[in-house]
């Protein structure tokens, strides 16, 4: 029982700390996303993405591919398009947030909801193939078409495996949930989420 109580306290402290940390980046995320998408873009989802990616911590991931910063960008993969847009590196937080918005703009497919764009950012273009197989821009129907492998992780000697479909499709749900915590999301037909 004590362990459960301590776990609840830890989770609530972590979540509260994440909320405060992320709040300090809201205006920078807004500026970065509006510079790429225009002022109708619901930038709150960009903040939600930082919550999902790093808990708004400027960290180097242990993912094995070199993802770094608040938005967990693998710079070596995005170096050329980012440099073309004036981002020479992502060591500074302002550059990380600019890079996040630039990447989001480059993977955005305007005929689909933003959920698909966030999933492309997270897991590549497979979601676009799943939408095509489903024949409709619908999260649930696209997920039904998902046929991916698993990712396995070992932590403290315990191996855990998860479906890559579950990981990628939960990602867009989390962005939606977390984004709503950073102000009223003003959706438009141009930038609908679902």
Please provide the spans of the model-predicted regions.
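Short glycine- and hydrophobic/aromatic-rich loop-to-beta-strand nucleating segment
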Residues: 71-73
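Conserved alpha-helical segments that form or flank metal/cofactor-binding pockets of metalloenzymes
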Residues: 50-62
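Extracytoplasmic
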Residues: 42-45, 68
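Non-catalytic cell-wall polysaccharide-engagement segments
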Residues: 13-39, 56-57, 75-194
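Short hydrophobic/aromatic-rich motifs at helix boundaries and adjacent loops
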Residues: 18-19, 49-51
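Sec-dependent N-terminal signal peptides
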Residues: 3-13
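Short Gly/aromatic-enriched secondary-structure transition segments
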Residues: 64-66
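Short alpha-helical scaffolding segments that buttress acidic/His motifs in well-ordered protein cores
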Residues: 46-50, 118-121
């Amino acid at each position: 029982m004590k362990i459960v109580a301590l776990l609840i306290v830890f989770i609530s402290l972590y979540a509260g700390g994440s909320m405060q940390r992320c709040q300090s980046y809201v205006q920078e995320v807004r500026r970065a996303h509006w510079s790429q998408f225009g002022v109708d873009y619901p930038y709150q989802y960009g903040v939600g993405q930082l919550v999902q990616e790093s808990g708004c911590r400027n960290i180097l991931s242990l993912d094995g591919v070199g993802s770094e910063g608040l938005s967990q960008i693998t710079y070596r993969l995005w170096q050329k398009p980012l440099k073309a847009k004036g981002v020479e590196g992502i060591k500074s937080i302002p550059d990380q947030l600019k890079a996040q918005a630039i990447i989001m703009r480059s993977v955005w497919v305007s005929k689909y909801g933003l959920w698909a764009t966030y999933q492309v950012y997270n897991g590549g273009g497979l979601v676009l193939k799943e939408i095509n197989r489903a024949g409709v821009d619908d999260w649930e129907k696209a997920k039904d078409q998902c046929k991916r492998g698993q990712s396995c992780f070992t932590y403290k000697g315990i191996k855990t495996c998860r479906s890559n479909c579950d990981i990628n499709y939960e990602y867009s749900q989390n962005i939606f949930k977390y984004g709503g915590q950073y102000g009223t999301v003003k959706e438009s037909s141009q930038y609908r989420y679902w």
